[in-house]
């Protein structure tokens, strides 16, 4: 369901059936964490997305139960509803993607039901971009996130692409493209990536891969 290569060379596999599998690519050894600590809070361990902090702790999107923080040393789970900062955020059934935005020093969570959550860990502050705060956003279901080389945040939604610029202004991609053949229909955007030349590749639900010249 999700893949992450952590800084220590481990591959983390979030599995739809439950739990996390780790692969040691240096020693070709597999480790499996069934996330029993998670099952104390909810009757599933189906991992939709995963992000590792510098200290090794994990943030995970859990199918049907939103977001959790996993302390790797203590093997303890903190659901977002019990988190001292994130407990004030809205409801979400899961988190589809998690990235760190360098420009603003924030963790960004692509939620299924509430747009994008932003969490500055050092400042202890969180805020949201959704259809209430930004009516120009046409869909609250966010599948993917990308911070480009200019510091803009790209939002891949169920209804196309939106861009949060460095001034925190939100635009739809179709407002910004200069060529009509680069405009996107209202379709799901599953993944985005930037190449070394600054082009953005966009994986769509049924329109193949689009390449956008920024």
Model-derived features: positions:
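Carboxylate-rich, polar loop motifs that coordinate divalent cations or form catalytic acidic clusters
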Residues: 1-214
